[in-house]
Amino acid sequence: MKIVGDSEHFKQPYDSDEEYVSKTEDKRDCEAAQKVGMELVSLSKTQLDKIELDEHLYDSIQQAHKIKPKTEAYRRHMQYIGKLMRNVDVEPIKAALAIVLNKNNNETAKLQMFEKMRERLLSQGDSEIQTLVEHYPQLDRQKLRTLVRQATKELAKGPESKSSKELFKYLRSEIQD
């Protein structure tokens, strides 16, 4: 009769030298990968082209754009994209996704800054022109003054004016931060 002691018989999965990953942790990783896949699906084609993806994953994301959201087929397809994401290293994709999304936020912030400049120019007039020319010497004071006067006259007639748009375009083209 053989007595079984501290042998292989009593070993648990976490007793090995390798790092043990529980089912719960594995599920969390899978859900995180699926969420990254959902973020990729929400991107436009131009944004998606900026991210380096596996060809099969890219095609699946393009197919997801063709499926109507809030349908069972869409849900299954999102799970399939999650499955594909599990086989790919997610970290570089997350980093590229953050860069693409942050770039859009930076562009929006710049546009809002130019919008505020235009509003200040239209409300404060020459004093704001002086401040802007001191801060941004590349601006042409005369052109700025002309655009502000035209925009102010046109704004009295209606909310949208051609000169106001020209002023915005001029500020955006001349000021590079």
From Swiss-Prot:
<dbReference type="GO" id="GO:0019843">
    <property type="term" value="F:rRNA binding"/>
</dbReference>
<dbReference type="GO" id="GO:1902626">
    <property type="term" value="P:assembly of large subunit precursor of preribosome"/>
</dbReference>
<comment type="function">
    <text>Member of a network of 50S ribosomal subunit biogenesis factors which assembles along the 30S-50S interface, preventing incorrect 23S rRNA structures from forming. Promotes peptidyl transferase center (PTC) maturation.</text>
</comment>
<keyword id="KW-0690">Ribosome biogenesis</keyword>
<dbReference type="InterPro" id="IPR023153">
    <property type="entry name" value="DarP_sf"/>
</dbReference>
<keyword id="KW-0963">Cytoplasm</keyword>
<keyword id="KW-0699">rRNA-binding</keyword>
<dbReference type="InterPro" id="IPR006839">
    <property type="entry name" value="DarP"/>
</dbReference>
<keyword id="KW-0694">RNA-binding</keyword>
<dbReference type="GO" id="GO:0043022">
    <property type="term" value="F:ribosome binding"/>
</dbReference>
<dbReference type="Pfam" id="PF04751">
    <property type="entry name" value="DarP"/>
</dbReference>
<protein>
    <recommendedName>
        <fullName>Dual-action ribosomal maturation protein DarP</fullName>
    </recommendedName>
</protein>
<feature type="region of interest" description="Disordered">
    <location>
        <begin position="1"/>
        <end position="26"/>
    </location>
</feature>
<comment type="similarity">
    <text>Belongs to the DarP family.</text>
</comment>
<dbReference type="GO" id="GO:0005829">
    <property type="term" value="C:cytosol"/>
</dbReference>
